[in-house]
Amino acid sequence: MRYLPLTPEDRAEMLARIGVASVDELFVDIPADKRETALPRLALHKSELEVERTLARLAGQNVPAGSVPFFVGAGAYRHHVPATVDHLIQRSEFLTSYTPYQPEIAQGTLQYLFEFQTQVAELTAMEVANASMYDGSTAAAEAVLMAHRVTRRRKAVLAGNLHPHYRSTIETVSRYAADEVVALPPAPFGEEDLITPIDDTVSCVVVQSPDVFGNLVDLKPIAEAAHKAGALLVAVFTEAVALGLIEPPGAQGADIVVGEGQSIGNALNFGGPYVGLFATRQKFVRQMPGRLAGETVDAEGRRGFVLTLSTREQHIRREKATSNICTNSGLCALAFTIHMSLLGKTGLTRLARANHAAACDLADRLAAVKGASVVNDTFFNEFTLRVPGPAADVVEKLAAKGILAGVPYSRLAPKSGLDDLILVAATETTTEDDRAAYAAALKEVL
């Protein structure tokens, strides 16, 4: 496709249409001394070899997660991904394919989406799941909007121990939808009161388990209180591996279950792309966002797969759409599906137990260090460590010793006042030597 630049007449017509007299007036918000009036003189291009060397030098400033003892979590977790996963998702049939609008030539894609949905539904103990969302936080925001549609109410209650990034995503979406959000304060040291705020004006209560501090939450009394008030319970998780060991949200009364699927089949990927999981009850399926792949038979009675539901704004009237999701996270969903298939139910449980055992061992070691304490009574593979003084300083000192010790909670919520807390994760990738090194280094810096 050729690039045809604007003519002076084209530019004048466009400026007149938006009500400005010149390009300078269009960019009046940018200080004059910050504007470039001519293209900068760029250095001559380098050879491919020189570019590779330059990028390698820059990359060398990073600390790869696998090169040091690594205990960072807070919503994204380092797990071992079998080589089979990466090998299969790089097949051109999957890597380059787009939305399967033509089922007659996209049966492979539709079938893996169907299998993905089945796995997510079984993992969460729900009746139906969609073909993925962008990530966990946007899935949570879509869940709140869905709850508003189902209940015809506009008020959501967010647990204080919901991940701050999930909270801010929900608040951003709600702000532009003119919805009300009641966000409770974080409560890392005790059980949250999530029942008192629920009344007959609330559409949903959003609860994370394991929560951002690592606590396991009993969802049953919250679900009972929500249903009694005519509201829905939206259950959130950031660590999908936990569902291999704990009671799934669907079995505890959740109406919508959303979460992050990154930790199964997907690497940390420098923060993305990730894959949002979304499951709900069958009776709410027509209010569910995204796409739904379904099983059917063709004219000759052969089994096949199609997009059963796809009520997004590209397909129907915008005001009737349940979401405006576009390409979603299909390749990440495929990676999730392959890894889950390799694990199986027994393998997932074994993986979850290994994670829990590693975290328990680490918690015991760190709690024995004078000045440090673990604030959780129950947790899966992540817990909260309380240290004297600013947690960010402790994390920096440990990093200087080659230990990536975790995430200061203040980094996620700078105004929370909880400056002495570190979120610490231990997965199957952490070794006993790693955990011993952490405890020894912590003893030195406190």
UniProtKB/Swiss-Prot annotation:
InterPro entries: GcvPA, GDC-P_N, GDC_P, PyrdxlP-dep_Trfase, PyrdxlP-dep_Trfase_major, PyrdxlP-dep_Trfase_small. Keywords: Oxidoreductase. It catalyses: N(6)-[(R)-lipoyl]-L-lysyl-[glycine-cleavage complex H protein] + glycine + H(+) = N(6)-[(R)-S(8)-aminomethyldihydrolipoyl]-L-lysyl-[glycine-cleavage complex H protein] + CO2. SUPFAM superfamilies: PLP-dependent transferases. One of its GO terms (biological process) is glycine decarboxylation via glycine cleavage system. It is an enzyme of class 1 (oxidoreductase). Its EC number is 1.4.4.2. GO terms for molecular function: glycine dehydrogenase (decarboxylating) activity. Disulfide bonds: none annotated. Belongs to the GcvP family. N-terminal subunit subfamily. The glycine cleavage system catalyzes the degradation of glycine. The P protein binds the alpha-amino group of glycine through its pyridoxal phosphate cofactor; CO(2) is released and the remaining methylamine moiety is then transferred to the lipoamide cofactor of the H protein. HAMAP family: GcvPA (MF_00712). The glycine cleavage system is composed of four proteins: P, T, L and H. In this organism, the P 'protein' is a heterodimer of two subunits. This is Probable glycine dehydrogenase (decarboxylating) subunit 1. It comes from Xanthobacter autotrophicus (strain ATCC BAA-1158 / Py2). The lineage of its organism: Bacteria, Pseudomonadati, Pseudomonadota, Alphaproteobacteria, Hyphomicrobiales. The gene is gcvPA.
